[in-house]
Amino acid sequence: MSEHAAAPGPGPNGGGGGGAAPVRGPRGPNLNPNPLINVRDRLFHALFFKMAVTYSRLFPPAFRRLFEFFVLLKALFVLFVLAYIHIVFSRSPINCLEHVRDRWPREGVLRVEVRHNSSRAPVILQFCDGGLGGLELEPGGLELEEEELTVEMFTNSSIKFELDIEPKVFKPQSGADALNDSQDFPFPETPAKVWPQDEYIVEYSLEYGFLRLSQATRQRLSIPVMVVTLDPTRDQCFGDRFSRLLLDEFLGYDDILMSSVKGLAENEENKGFLRNVVSGEHYRFVSMWMARTSYLAAFVIMVIFTLSVSMLLRYSHHQIFVFIVDLLQMLEMNMAIAFPAAPLLTVILALVGMEAIMSEFFNDTTTAFYIILTVWLADQYDAICCHTNTSKRHWLRFFYLYHFAFYAYHYRFNGQYSSLALVTSWLFIQHSMIYFFHHYELPAILQQIRIQEMLLQTPPLGPGTPTALPDDLNNNSGSPATPDPSPPLALGPSSSPAPTGGASGPGSLGAGASVSGSDLGWVAETAAIISDASFLSGLSASLLERRPTAPSTPDSSRPDPGVPLEDAPAPAGS
């Protein structure tokens, strides 16, 4: 970000002399006193440059445009699916359970299942001595299908839902019944049944304890259980054929079941509790009022979460990089190093705590994890891939716009279809990354390669041959063109600042190479990175205390390892 901004010409140079000092000119003033940060930035920049060049050679422009269009088309399709599902199922009430609204047992459990082409009766009453309103009683032969979940399915993130709920345990009066307390709320240790992933079963009850009872205990205590079977091929509440296709192939029926049960819970004073039998997650229905002012709260929460996660991740990256540098020093110089246990442990605990806070907000650890992953990818893209002024100025705005759209949707509609909204937001963020890379970063890199090739094809330094190029670049026809060898220094990292003439050198170089004045810092910086190809091959040497391996010339008091050996004759001319 700010470390990539172009710096004024005479600032870091100290006014004139052309040695290795102007290496860091285009990256702006040295805001990072730690040299390891500069080394890390140059390393990532060189890796990004090599990957971009390889990408441009492997894939032609037509393929790149086609790939970019495909990503945009995919994002628009997912957005259309989200809008369609929201209009069809969220704006209109789900009436799949309207036929049992007045008949389901308030003192028992309502079990709702989704079965394709089921031959069972739509409504069955279990574990009741007599029928309820003429309902059919289920024979005992089907009892084996109603087994309890395994312990493994309850050891997931659903524990956080159970901590917010106080189970209502009623102590029996007699001592004989008190001995069977552990059987009233069983938690079987042996797996009873593993539900397939295509099963959709939820249970709803006004009493939380009824949801924790096994099927055998419910039958022994004669707790009525009404089983409602919904068939997507027959019931009209699942929408038209296209809606059923989306639900069956992409979204699933969990949200439909929860919305149907929520319609029943809205008419009850005690909103009750819901259990997803397949996943083992427990939910509690609460009354929430969401106004349009919730968008402001969503924006504030997004800014806090995004900045906190970005800061913690950058700090962890820095600590890991420092440890790698210390390890290389130990291997080369046989030095004893101290493992930075305290900083790494601090940042790990901070990230775990941040994920826990985000999980409480989103009511889902998976959503919180993917949001952290999205912020990390966006932060890496901004720090490594954004070098042109257009990308640095505008890409973050697109990222915050798409990211805020997810937060606003989640916060406004209470987390319904949040997973699909997060996928939509990420696809648009991904398209913005590809678009800015194809239209701004990659053309600047390819143009700088053409400039580098043009400069490499110039004749070697001589008394008469190089005079045409400096005269054209500097617009000076006088004799001072001979002692000014700075234009050939564009091959190395010292080509970034202007020579003695303030703004004439970079301005004329941009005019001769057709480069805009706003991107001159990026052009010079990329030229320095091209010359730093040897920096990757000798990584361990450049990460340590950088010492001149060749005898220093009288004019270069601080040689830089990024300067290639081909540039050695340049200071000699001064």
UniProtKB/Swiss-Prot annotation:
GO biological process, any: response to endoplasmic reticulum stress
Which sites does the entry annotate for glycosylation?
N180
Keyword entries, A-Z: Acetylation, Endoplasmic reticulum, Glycoprotein, Membrane, Transmembrane, Transmembrane helix
Q: Which Pfam families match?
A: Membralin (PF09746)
Would you tell me the Gene Ontology cellular component terms?
A: endoplasmic reticulum; endoplasmic reticulum membrane
Q: List the disulfide bonds.
A: none
| Region annotation Disordered: where it falls in the sequence | 1-27, 461-515, 546-574
Q: Where in the cell is it found?
A: Endoplasmic reticulum membrane
Q: In which tissues is it expressed?
A: Detected in brain, spinal cord, lung, liver and kidney.
What spans are recorded as compositionally biased (Low complexity)? 461-470, 491-501
Q: How does it sit in the membrane?
A: Multi-pass membrane protein
Q: Which residues carry this modification: N-acetylserine?
A: S2
The transmembrane residues are 69-89, 293-313, 337-357, 417-437
Coarsely, its chief localization is: endoplasmic reticulum
Is Transmembrane helix among the key words of this record? yes
| Deleted gene: phenotype | Lethality typically occurs several days after birth, associated with motor neuron deficiency and paresis.
Its function, per the record, reads: May have a role in the ERAD pathway required for clearance of misfolded proteins in the endoplasmic reticulum (ER). Promotes survival of motor neurons, probably by protecting against ER stress.
Instruction: Tell me the protein family, please.
Output: Belongs to the membralin family.
On assembly, the entry states: Interacts with ERLIN2.
Task: Tell me the protein's name.
Answer: Membralin
Q: Which organism is it from?
A: Mus musculus
